[in-house]
């Protein structure tokens, strides 16, 4: 346990603005790995007494297992948003989270902010919408109508690979995937050059905002 704590401490000391902005893909994956280690340690501490006590029947076991799984899913989704938010702040990007758009939709990230989105004199070409989902599957469609002013939606995901048919459908619907750079190799070769690594996405946003 002490060795694990020292390892986590050493990683934390190496974090600075330069390393985050120059290698956001690498930093994000390192944060996710470290957070998962901490969360597993927390889970063991929290659940061990219950597991040692046991369960009276199958239904109790299933119910308790579902609680654990739901907590894991909730943590993973929220932590991804928080990690991305931290990276965007270090990279000096202007953005706002949970902006209320049409029909009370709330995209995860709007660049540069909600006021610009709702100002119809602000050029739509300078607006960017980014959704963040740990996995895509069929959930990617949720972002399609979250920001009507922005025709091309960006979607960040940690999913390692999506079927060729689903990728084709995504790009027909003007969804541009953003994934950690090391994960691009898991996608069909014919789509790899269309997928943005995180460092390219932050550079893309920065270039637009430098023109404002």
Describe the residue ranges of each PLM region.
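A short acidic, amphipathic alpha-helical/loop segment
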Residues: 141-146, 166-170
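Short, small-residue-biased leader/transition segments that mark boundaries at the very start
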Residues: 3-8
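Hydrophobic alpha-helical interaction segments
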Residues: 12-51
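Conserved catalytic cores of phosphodiester-cleaving nucleases, focusing on short active-site segments
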Residues: 88, 109-136, 143-145, 155
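Acidic-basic catalytic patches of nuclease active cores, encompassing PD-(D/E)XK
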Residues: 57-105
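Hydrophobic beta-strand segments of well-ordered beta-sheets in folded domains
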Residues: 128, 151-157, 174-177
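Domain-level recognition of nuclease-like catalytic cores that cleave nucleotide substrates
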Residues: 160-212
């Amino acid at each position: 346990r002490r060795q694990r704590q020292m390892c986590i401490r050493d990683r934390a000391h190496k974090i600075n603005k330069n390393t985050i902005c120059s290698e956001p893909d690498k930093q994000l994956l390192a944060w996710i790995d470290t957070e998962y280690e901490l969360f597993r340690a927390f889970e063991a501490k929290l659940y061990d007494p219950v597991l040692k006590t046991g369960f009276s029947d199958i239904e109790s076991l299933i119910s308790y297992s579902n609680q654990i799984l739901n907590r894991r899913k909730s943590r993973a989704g929220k932590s991804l948003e928080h990690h991305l938010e931290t990276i965007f702040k270090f990279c000096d990007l202007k953005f706002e989270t949970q902006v209320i758009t049409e029909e009370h939709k709330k995209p995860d990230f709007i660049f540069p902010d909600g006021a610009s989105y709702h100002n119809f004199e602000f050029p739509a070409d300078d607006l960017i919408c980014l959704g963040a989902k740990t996995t895509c599957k069929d959930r990617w469609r949720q972002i399609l109508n979250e920001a009507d002013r922005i025709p091309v939606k960006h979607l960040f995901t940690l999913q390692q690979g999506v079927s060729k048919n689903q990728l084709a459908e995504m790009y027909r619907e003007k969804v541009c995937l953003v994934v950690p750079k090391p994960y691009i190799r898991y996608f069909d070769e014919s789509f790899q050059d269309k997928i943005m690594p995180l460092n390219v996405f932050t550079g893309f946003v920065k270039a637009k905002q430098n023109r404002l």
